[in-house]
Amino acid sequence: MGTLTDPTVDPADPHVKADDGAGLIDAGQVHPERLETLAEDQSQRDGANGVHFPVKTNTGNAAESTASTENGETGSIDVGKLRTKPSPVQTHIHRGGSEGLYRGASGGIYRSASGSTHIHRGASGGILRGQSGGIHRGRSGAIHLPSLQSISFSMTRLPEEDAGVMMHFTETKETETTPESSRASDEDAPTPKKKHRLRKHLTAIGAYSFAFRFSETVLSLIAIVVMCSTRGSMRTDGVDFGTLKFNHFQAYRYLVAVNVIVFVYSTFQFIQLLYTVILGISFIPSIFISTWMTFGFDQLFLYLLLSASTSAATVANMSYTGEMGIQLCSRFDVGSFCSKADVAVTMSFFAVLAMLSSTILAIYRIAVLLREY
C-alpha cells in the first residue's frame, strides 16, 4: 500500500508520536509495515469499510493530519486534507482502480486512465428539465427534443363577414420522454414533430348567408344576360317597323343597371366570405364595422332592385294588356321579345328575395353585436 509520512514532521525527532487508539508510538521508530498493520487492526475494531488513524505532533500549533483508507465500489483510497481545528469539514477524493478521478455517485467529473475528462450526469446520462418539455442530451452529445402530443379545441365566434364561422384549431403539446435505459443511443430518441393547423367551418347561419350571396350573384347575372339579349322584329300586316330592343324602354334599362350593381356587390360579398372561410382573413378587420356596412349596403341595394323589378314588371304587363287598346306583344308579333323580358323580370324578383334574406341575416348579426357590446 505504501508508506504514509507527514512532510512537516522530522522522522528523526524522538518526540513525534503516532496514536493507534491504544497508546503513543515513536514515529521515528515505526516501520511503514507497522503503520499498515495498525491500520488493519483499527479497521477490524471499528467494523467500518476503512481505516482511520491520526498522526499527532508536539509542535504546539494545534494541527491534525488525518488520513483514511476506504475500500469503495472500485477499491478507492480516500486521502483527507490537512485541516485546522475546530473545522469539521472534510473533503474526500475517490481514486478508482483505473487511476482516475471520480466525484460523487450520481454525478460529477470522471477522469479516465488516458487523461480525458467525462461528464456524468445522472443515471439516464442526460439533462432533464421539467415534465412539460426540455432538452435531453445523450451520451454521444446529440440533443433530443421531447415528443409532441396533439391537442385540439374548437371555438365559435361572430365573423367579420356575413356568415357565422366555426374556427377549429389543432395545435401541439410538448411532453417529456425519458430514455428507457441510460445507454439509449441517439437513434432511439423520438423524432419531434410540430403541426399547427387552422380550419374554419361554416355554421348554419354562415351556410345560409353563403347560399344567399351565391344566389344573388347568379340570378342578377341571368337577369342581365337575358334582358340584354331581348330583341325582336316588329311586323304587322306585312309592314316592318324595325327591330325592337330592350333599351327602347326606360324601365328595362333601369332594371339592367340595377342588376349590374347588385351583381358586383354580391360577387364582392361572396368572394369576401369565401376568402375568410378558406384563409381566415377578412377584408375589414373590425366585426362591428363590417356588420353595419353589410347591413347598410344590403338595405340600399334591396330597395333599388325592388324598385327596378316592379318598374320592369309594369312595362311587361302593359305589353300584354296594351295601352289605349294597343297590345304590343300580340299585334306586332314580338312574342319572343316579351317572353325574354318576362324571364329577366322574374330572375330580378328572385334576386330581390335573396337580397331580402341576406338583409334579415344582417339584422340578426346586429342584434348579436348589440347584446354582446
From Swiss-Prot:
Gene Ontology cellular component list: plasma membrane
Positions annotated with a glycan in the UniProt record: N317
Major subcellular site: membrane
Residues in the Extracellular compartment per record: 226-253, 298-342
InterPro entries the record matches: CASP/CASPL, CASP_dom
Record region (Disordered): 1-100, 172-195
Membrane topology listed for this record: Multi-pass membrane protein
Transmembrane helix in keyword set: yes
Biased composition, class Polar residues, residue ranges: 56-74
Keyword Cell membrane: yes
Localization annotation: Cell membrane
Topology Cytoplasmic: residue spans: 1-204, 275-276, 364-373
Transmembrane region(s): 205-225, 254-274, 277-297, 343-363
Keywords for this protein: Cell membrane, Glycoprotein, Membrane, Transmembrane, Transmembrane helix
Quaternary structure and partners: Homodimer and heterodimers.
The family this protein is said to belong to: Belongs to the Casparian strip membrane proteins (CASP) family.
Protein name according to UniProt: CASP-like protein UU6
